[in-house]
């Protein structure tokens, strides 16, 4: 069995998140060039916002995708995978946009709630399935 047939939903989200990370990485790099700050943030608030938005993305997305893959391998229904993956995607986009624009606000909280919902949903399914609870 190949990865596409084993993880048909997760693999789509892996590809989408990988592509989304490219402009985030480029935004940090471009700001570094503009400010001549090769390391850390140099006291530049815009660079710091971009770094943290990118950093938060890279801190949360990989573990969420691993949990999603585990849920898919454990037999999670596609509706659960698509809804959890979409919540993660929307959550990360809203959170990123809020951090790089204002840094604070309702969008940031909504983004984290959507992200956390997938971080509860996927491993929750796996644990229930592992414990033999009907899901």
Name each region found by the language model.
Residues 1-8, 46, 50-56, 72, ...:
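Juxtamembrane loop-transmembrane helix junctions in multi-pass integral membrane proteins
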Residues 56-68, 119:
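Core segments of transmembrane alpha-helices
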Residues 17-20, 24, 87-95, 118-125:
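Membrane-embedded alpha-helical transmembrane segments of multi-pass integral membrane proteins
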Residues 8-36:
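N-terminal signal-anchor transmembrane alpha helix
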Residues 64-65, 71-100:
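Mid-chain, well-packed structural core segment of small domains
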Residues 26-52:
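Cytosolic, membrane-interface loops and tails of multi-pass inner-membrane proteins
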Residues 94-120:
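Interfacial loop-to-transmembrane junctions
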